[in-house]
Amino acid sequence: MADSALSIRTIDESDMPEFSRVMAWAFLDDPRGVDSKWLKVLEHDRAHAILDGDEIIGTGGVLSREITVPGGLQVPAGAVTVVTVKPGHRRRGVASLLMKTQLHGMHESGEPIAILWASEGAIYRRFGYGELATSLNRMTMPTRMAFHPGVPVSDTRIRQVTREEALPFMREVHDRVRRTKVGWLSRVEATWEVQLGDREVDRNGLTSYRYCLHPEGYVVFRVKGGGGPRGPQDELHVRELVCETDQAYADLYRFLLDIDLATEISFYTAADDPILHMVDNPRKVGRDLGDALWLRIVDVDRALPLRRYSSDVDSVLEVEDSFCPWNSGRWRFTVKGGEAVVARTEDPADVSLDVAALGSAYLGGVRLSVLKRAHRVVEHTPGHVDALTLAFIGVCEPHCPEVF
């Protein structure tokens, strides 16, 4: 419960200096980067300051986005960002007040899901966010790796261009591709500035971005210089690799692997990235899997019908949601031909789960059968968890390449 001395309101331009200082303190960030980077994307009517008297002690914002869900459909999502509490004011209910304000606002406006990146993994499940809604795979691989003989590489020329030349093409390609990739988000102009910020403070000792265009895709990367008695040992740090076709994907990876003077490539990608099955020795590829998006079902009856499902099912779900009580209770969830109908019911429950477990499974990356084994899902009618698992599972692992 929030401290009764606290208040919450939306921000205006005059709040920005103090708002950014609180963010920098909480994230242990460089205030120079916070001022002009993250604040560019904030929507003032959806950004909140939590105050103790006149002092801002907490921050939070919601970005209006679309997320691609199974079936290639676009669903409005509240992308929760810059959630901070000023040191010295923890355990006063600051985060609870912010979360309640955000989620109740999304419910009233009809935004069916909320998403966020969690800086600390123990915080958000209690607010109904499901972990591992998407996963993020950090890969490192040595250059000069060969593809197996079945991978075609075309002679298409990949052009190295300026940022100004690249951006119009990249915007168009990204918007087409993100509509086909589960977990990808829409972008507004300010998002491009954040994702590809290229001031000195953004580079962490690396070079400025290189922009390389294929007719059906692009790659953006920085270089970390290195070397010694054995010669150059530069590293390529890929920021984005976006492709409309499998051929462009193979061509761009081959381009990166063959860059002179580089010895290693590092990049963040989907858990099921096909590059592991393209190279001739996948054991040389380093992998480090972690959580990415956390997803919160704001309205069960709105969110579940907005995606497509892999098999028919008819189950009664008993959902527990203490933070958004309109979701609590029993729902008949019926899928036929990939489309779902959700309605209140008094029938006995086949499966019980909390709203966070439902959020983890929503994009198809977490199996409800696994959550059952983890004691997060309870089966009352034998066979229903397996049937629901098959319905929710997607044809690919969900992935969100964009931190917000």
For the regions a protein language model found, what residue spans apply to each?
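Intrinsically disordered, low-complexity, positively biased terminal segments
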Residues: 1-16, 70, 149-404
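Hydrophobic, small-residue-rich alpha-helical packing segments that form membrane-like cores
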Residues: 8-13, 23, 48, 93
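Active-site rim helix/loop that mediates acceptor-substrate recognition in acyltransferases
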Residues: 24-70, 183-210
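Conserved beta-strand in the GNAT
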Residues: 49, 55-64, 79, 84, ...
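Conserved acetyl-CoA-binding loop-helix of GNAT-fold acetyltransferases
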Residues: 82-85, 91-104, 246-257
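Conserved active-site alpha-helix within GNAT-family acetyltransferase domains
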Residues: 107-112, 117-138, 272-287
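Glycine-/small-residue-rich beta-strand-loop submotif within the FAD-binding core of flavoenzymes
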Residues: 137-151
